[in-house]
Amino acid sequence: MARNKIALIGSGMIGGTLAHLAGLKELGDVVLFDIAEGTPQGKGLDIAESSPVDGFDAKFTGANDYAAIEGADVVIVTAGVPRKPGMSRDDLLGINLKVMEQVGAGIKKYAPEAFVICITNPLDAMVWALQKFSGLPAHKVVGMAGVLDSARFRYFLSEEFNVSVEDVTVFVLGGHGDSMVPLARYSTVAGIPLPDLVKMGWTSQDKLDKIIQRTRDGGAEIVGLLKTGSAFYAPAASAIQMAESYLKDKKRVLPVAAQLSGQYGVKDMYVGVPTVIGANGVERIIEIDLDKDEKAQFDKSVASVAGLCEACIGIAPSLK
C-alpha cells in the first residue's frame, strides 16, 4: 500500500516541526517546500537522519518547485512572514496575502485533491483567501486556530486546578485573534462545567476571566518572550492532530476555521467553530446555542474577520 504524501508549504520553524511530527507519527512521506534554496533540503535530510534513532520509516524530500507537491493527500501551509514583538496578526495581511496567491496557484495545479490546512496569519482571512485562490471545495480547506487556542486554554486551566490536561475539555469559538471567544459554560474538568467549579470554590471568577484573557493573548505572550519569532511547537502539534484525523478518518470533533454557509448566522466566511474532521474533510459543522452575551462576543469576532476579508479584497479585487 502506498504511503500518504504530506506536503508542507514553508520550511521555517513550524514547517520543520510539522515534518518531524509527521515522521514520528508515521503519517506518510513528507515534502518540505520553501522558496529559500537549501532550507527544505537541509531540514528534510536532518529529520531523515533521525529516523533510525526514533524508529520510523518515511521519505523526506526538500524542494523549491511546487511540482514536488504533486498528488499530495494533505497540504499544510505555513508560508509567510511570522509575527514580531509589537505586531498583531492583522499587521501581516498585505505581505501574506500575496504569498497565499502563489501558494493557492501551486495547490490548484499540483494537489487539487488534497485536504489543505492553513496556519499562516492573520489566519481567518488567509484561509478564506487561500480557498478562493486555490479553487478547492470549502470542505477540503480549513484553518488551524481553535485546536491551538483550545490547547492553550486547557493548559492554563490544568495549571490553575492542578489536574491533568487530559481531563480538561474546552470550547473556543470565533476568529483566531484578540476577539476569540472561549466559552466557559461549555468547558469542563472531568465533565464538571467551569461555572460550577467556580461555585465549588476551585477558582474565582476573576481568576477564570484572567485565564480567558491569557488564552486570547497566548500567541502574543510567546512572541514577546522569543522576541525573534512566534510559537511553533504547539501550532505544529495542533495541525498534525487535524491532518491525522483526516488521513485516518478518525472523525475527531475539532475546533477549526471552517467556511460557514448560514451556521451561526454567517455565510461565506471562515470562522472558528467545532467540526467533525474525517476522510471527507469537514464532515459536519456543530452549531451550539449561544446566550445573549456569548452571541454578542461571537458577532464581534465575526465582524473583525469580515473587516480583514474586506481589506484583502481591497488588495486583491479578484477575491470578491
Curated annotation (Swiss-Prot):
| One record GO biological process | tricarboxylic acid cycle
Enzyme class name: oxidoreductase
The lineage is: Bacteria, Pseudomonadati, Pseudomonadota, Alphaproteobacteria, Hyphomicrobiales
The gene from which this protein is expressed is mdh
The record's listing under PANTHER family reads: L-2-HYDROXYCARBOXYLATE DEHYDROGENASE (NAD(P)(+)), L-LACTATE DEHYDROGENASE
Residues forming the catalytic site: H176
Question: CDD domains per the record?
Answer: LDH-like_MDH
Which family is it part of?
Belongs to the LDH/MDH superfamily. MDH type 3 family.
- Decide whether keyword Oxidoreductase is in the record: yes
- Give a GO molecular function annotation for the protein: L-malate dehydrogenase (NAD+) activity
- Supply the alphabetized keyword list: NAD, Oxidoreductase, Tricarboxylic acid cycle
Question: EC number(s) of the enzyme?
Answer: 1.1.1.37
Protein's job: Catalyzes the reversible oxidation of malate to oxaloacetate.
Q: Please give the name of this protein.
A: Malate dehydrogenase
Q: List residues binding substrate.
A: R83, R89, N121, R152
Q: Which InterPro entries match?
A: L-lactate/malate_DH, Lactate/malate_DH_C, Lactate/malate_DH_N, Lactate_DH/Glyco_Ohase_4_C, Malate_DH_type3, NAD(P)-bd_dom_sf
Q: Which reaction does it catalyse?
A: (S)-malate + NAD(+) = oxaloacetate + NADH + H(+)
Check the record and name the Gene3D superfamilies matching this protein: Lactate dehydrogenase/glycoside hydrolase, family 4, C-terminal, NAD(P)-binding Rossmann-like Domain
Q: Where does NAD(+) bind?
A: G10, S11, G12, M13, I14, G15, D34, N96, I119, T120, N121
